[in-house]
Amino acid sequence: MPRSLLGRMLLLTLLAVLVAQGLSSLFWLSHLRSSQREGLLTSSRSLAYSMAASVSYFRSLPLGYRPLVLDQLRSMGGTRFFVSLNDRPLEMRALPDTPNKQAVLEIVQDVLHQRLGKEVELQVEFVSPDELRLFNGALKLDELPRSWAHYALTLEPVNPPVLVTQIRIGESEWLYIASLMPAPYVSLEPEGLQPQQVLSIVFTSLLLLLFTGLLMHWQSRPLKRLARAARDLALGSPSAALEERGASELVEVARAFNTMHERIDRYLNERGQLFSAISHDLRTPITRLRLRVELLEDERLQEKFGRDLDELELLVKGALQCVKDTDIHENVESVDLNLLLQHIAEPYLADGRVEVVGRAAEPYPGKPLALKRCIGNLLDNALKYGERARLSLEDGPEAVVLHVDDDGPGVPEQRLEQIFEPRFRLSPRGQGYGLGLGIARNIAHTHGGEVSLQNRREGGLRVSLRLPRLGLE
C-alpha cells in the first residue's frame, strides 16, 4: 500500500476503474452474446427453410434431370449452396460440440423434418473446410474449380465452418448440400472483446487515472502546506498564516490551524512575560531577605536561613533555566552531528572519560543550539552518575539515533519515566532539581524525536535520542 495520499487515491481509483470496466465489459459481452445467439438461431431457421425448398425441388425432378440441373447450376457459377448427388452419405470429421453448434443443428433438423416429413433420413453436421469431402468422398474442396464451390463455401481470410446436410431422396441417392452460415453469423464461436475495445478500455482508464492524479495533486497541495506549517510550529520556526482557500473542508482545517497557531504564540508570549515577571519579583525579596539574614546576631540561625535562601534561589534559577532551555527561538539549519559531538565531548576526551563512535552520513536539519544543549544534558547526566560515557551514533534513512551509555548503577524499571519529571531525584541527597533529562526530552520532541531510557544488561543506563530524518526539511 502506498504511503502518500496521492498514491493511495490512484491505487483505489485504479481498482475502482478495473472493477467498473470489468463489470461493464461482462454485462456488455453477455448482452452481445445473447443477441448473437438469437440472431444465429434466426439465421439458422431461415437457412433451413431454404434447404428444405431446394430438397423439395430436387425431389420433384425426374431422376434423369437431376444431374443435368446440377451441371447447369455449376456452369452458371453456383448458388449460395453447393449441391451434389452421392450414392451414400459421406463420412467426415465433425467439429467439436459447442452450445451454439448444438442449437443450430437442432433447429435445422427440426425445420427439415417439419418440411420434408418425419420419416426422411438425413444427417446434419458442421465440418471444417479442410475436412470437407465432395463427390462420393473422392475430392477435397481445394481440388475443385473455384467457380464450383469456393463462392458458397469459403470466406477469406476467415475460415468459417461449413454446414453439411445429407438427405436421402431415393434408393442409393443422397442429396449433398453444403453452405456457410449467413453473415454476420459465419462463426459458431461466442463473440469476445475486440482489440479495439480493449485499447479503448485501457485508454479510458489511463485518462481517468491521469485526471484523478492531477486533481488529487492539486487538492493535496494545501495539505502539504499544512504539514509544513505544523513542522515549523513544532520546531518553533516563524511561519506565516496558512491561506484559507480551496475546498470548504480544507478552508476549515486551515482556519482551525491558524487559530491554534495564534493561541500557541499568545500562550508562549504570555508564559515568557510571566516568568520574566516572576524572576524579577522573586529576586528582589530574596535579595532583601539575604540582607536581613546578615543582620542576625545568631550565626547558627543565620546559616540556617542562608541555606534555605540558597535552595530557594536555586529553585527559581532552575525553573527559569527550564523555560529558557525549552523555548529556544532558532531557525532550522543543517547541523553536522559529527562535529557537534566532537565539540561537546572534547573537554572529556583527554582523560578518556568519553568515547565517541559512529558517524552521521549527512547533516541533520535542526536547531544547533538546542541540539547542543540536549546532547550536553544527556552527557552531563551520564558523567554525573557513571563517571564514564560512550556516545554511539547510528545513521539511517529514516532517523539518526544517538545512544549515551554510562557505567552507573542504573535506574529501577518502575522509575524510568519518573526521571524526566522536574525536581525528581533518585537520591534525596543529590544536588540539583532533575531538570536536565526533562529539558533534553522536550528539545527532542520539538524536533519530532524522542528520548528513551533502558538499563543495560552489563550494568549502567542507556539513554537513546532518536531524531527522525523524514519530513524535517
UniProtKB/Swiss-Prot annotation:
EC number(s) reported in the record: 2.7.13.3
Reactions accelerated catalytically: ATP + protein L-histidine = ADP + protein N-phospho-L-histidine
Modification comment: Autophosphorylated.
Subcellular location: Cell inner membrane
Annotated GO MF terms: ATP binding; phosphorelay sensor kinase activity
PROSITE patterns documented for this protein: HAMP (PS50885), HIS_KIN (PS50109)
Membrane topology: Multi-pass membrane protein
Residue numbers bearing the Phosphohistidine modification: H280
Periplasmic-side positions: 30-197
Disruption phenotype: Inactivation of the gene results in elevated ingestion and reduced cytotoxicity of eukaryotic cells during P.aeruginosa infection.
Residues spanning the membrane: 9-29, 198-218
Classification via Pfam families: HAMP, HATPase_c, HisKA
Superkingdom of source: Bacteria
All copies of domain Histidine kinase, residue ranges: 277-471
Cytoplasmic-side positions: 1-8, 219-473
Keyword set, alphabetical order: ATP-binding, Cell inner membrane, Cell membrane, Kinase, Membrane, Nucleotide-binding, Phosphoprotein, Transferase, Transmembrane, Transmembrane helix, Two-component regulatory system
InterPro entries recorded: 2C_sensor_his_kinase, HAMP_dom, HATPase_C_sf, His_kinase_dom, HisK_dim/P_dom, HisK_dim/P_sf, Sig_transdc_His_kin-like_C
Induction notes from the record: Induced during infection of airway epithelial cells.
Function: Member of the two-component regulatory system GtrS/GltR involved in the regulation of glucose metabolism and transport, as well as regulation of the exotoxin A gene expression. GtrS recognizes and binds 2-ketogluconate and 6-phosphogluconate via its sensor domain, which accelerates GtrS autophosphorylation and concomitant transphosphorylation and regulation of the response regulator GltR. Plays a key role during bacteria-host interactions and is required for optimal colonization and dissemination in a mouse model of infection. Contributes to modulation of the type III secretion system (T3SS) in response to host cells via the regulation of the OprB transport system.
Protein name (record): Sensor histidine kinase GtrS
Organism the protein comes from: Pseudomonas aeruginosa (strain ATCC 15692 / DSM 22644 / CIP 104116 / JCM 14847 / LMG 12228 / 1C / PRS 101 / PAO1)
UniProt gene name: gtrS
